[in-house]
Amino acid sequence: MEPLGATRHGLADVALDNAVQRPVWHEADAREWTVTTAPSSGEVDVAIIGGGFSGLWTAYYFSLARPDWSIAVFESQRVGFGASGRNGGWCSGMFALSPSELTETFGRDAALHAYAASFATLNEIEAVLVREGIECGWHRGGSITSATIPLQRVRLQGDLAKQHAIGVSEADLRWLNADETRAEMNLADTYGAVYTPHCATVNPFQMVLGLARVLRQRGVQLWESSPVAAIEPGVVRHTTDGKPGAVRAGLVVQATEGYSPSFRQTRRAMVPLYSLMVATEPLSPEVLAQLNWSRRATFTDGGRMIIYAQLTADGRIAIGGRGAPYHFGSRIKPSFDIDDETHRRIAKAIARHFPPASGARITHRWGGPLGVPRDWTPSVVVDRTANYARIGGYTGDGVACTNLLARTVVDEWLEHDSPLRNLPFIGHRSPEWEVEPLRFIGVNSLIHLSDSIDTHEARTGRSPKIRTALIENLL
C-alpha cells in the first residue's frame, strides 16, 4: 500500500505541475547585485576560474594572506550559478569516501588527518560567517544515515565498525537505535541510524552571495558573464559580450568542478552527474509537530541511490537525489536541470520517509551538475612551472570541502607552515574517466544498477549478488 497522500502515479504528478523551476534558496536573497564583466585585457596576481564556493573561498583566503595582491574571479554566468547556489544545503564534514575508504588509498594516519581537518572546517566556516556578518541560516544539527530496511542496518553497522577500527571516535560517528533515531525525526521506517555531529544546514545561495559581497568589499574583482575559453600558462582567455579578451596572471586557479570537462586540461578529469531536488511549501505547525524533526539533523538513507534531505529554516522539506541520466560527452544543458521522472521519484520519497508531510504542496524543483572524479577523491594540484593550480573533486560533498581545499591551495602556493600542507589530497591525481562511449555506458549502468539493487533489497530483504558484484567492479 502506498503512503497516505501518494497516488498510483506518484505524489508529484499533480504537485509538479505548478512547481517553480528554480532553487528554493533563491527566494531568500533579493538584494540588488551589479554585474561587472572582465576587461578585454589586463594583469592580476591571481586569476580564479569559477564563481562558486571553490573559487570564492580561494579568493577570500588569498585576500587575507596577501591583501596587496590583485585578485580576480571569472564566472561564465553569475556567482553561485552552479552547484554552489543550488545544492542540498548540507555543510558536511564527511567526504564522499569514508575514513576506511580513504585509508585504502592514503593510509590510516593520512585518512584520519584529512577527516580531522574536514571536521574542523565547520568551525572555520562558522567563524567566517560570524566575523563577516554573512547571514545564511547556518544551523548545526548533525546528520543521520537511516537504515530503512534490516539489510541496510547490517551494512551500516558493519561500515561503522570499520571506521571505529581505524580510530574514528564515537564522538564523531555513532550508532542510534530505532528509538533514538525517531527522537531525531519521526521517520516512517527506521531500524537505526549512523549519526555524526559534523554537519550544518545552510541556505547555500545566501552563503555564496554573502561571501561574494565580502570579497567585493575586500577589493577582489568578480567578473561575471565572462566565460573562459582557454587556460594557458599565466593567461586566461575569455569572451565578454562576444568579444575575445586575455588577462595575464601570476597564478591561474581552476575551480570549475562539474564544468571541468569544457576545458582541455580537464576534459576527462570529472563527469558532470546531475543531482535534482524538490522543496515543499512551509509545513504547518501540526505537521512539524508530527515530524518531530527536533534538531533539524540532515537525513539520508542507507540505499545505493542517494537521497538527501533537510528541514529548512522556514519549515520546508528540501529533498534531493541522484538518478537523472548522464549525458553523452559530458554535456551540460539548462534543459537537463529538469527531469520529470527523477523529480517524481524524489517527491514520492517525502511520503515514504515523512508521511505527515505527504500532502504538502511541492513549490520548487530544480537540478544541476556536480563533479565526480573517477576515484571519488578530492585533489589539490599545483604546477609552479605553468603558474597553475586546480582544486575540486567533491562528488556532491563540497560545501565544507571547498573551504578546506581553498585554504590548502593557498597555503601550498604560498608555502605556509601549515598542517594543511600534509593533507593527502595535495598532488593527488585521480585517474581519467574512460573515453566515450564507454563512459556513457558505464556511468548510466551504475545509475540503473544502483536503483535496481535498492528495489530488489527493499522487496526481498536480500542483496542481489551478481548485480552487487557488477557495480563494485564498475566502481
In which residue ranges do the predicted regions lie?
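C-terminal catalytic lobe of FAD-dependent flavoproteins
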Residues: 319, 325-449
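Glycine-rich Rossmann-fold phosphate-binding loop(s) that bind the pyrophosphate
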Residues: 50-54, 76
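Dinucleotide-binding Rossmann-like beta1-alpha1 core, especially the glycine-rich loop
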Residues: 94-178
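Flavin-dependent oxidoreductases
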Residues: 231-312
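Helical element adjacent to the flavin cofactor pocket in flavoenzyme catalytic cores
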Residues: 161-166, 188-250
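Short beta-strand to alpha-helix junction loop
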Residues: 113-119, 146-155, 194-214, 223, ...
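Glycine-rich FAD pyrophosphate-binding loop
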Residues: 63-86
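Extreme N-terminal leader/targeting segments of oxidoreductases
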Residues: 1-46, 64-65, 69-70
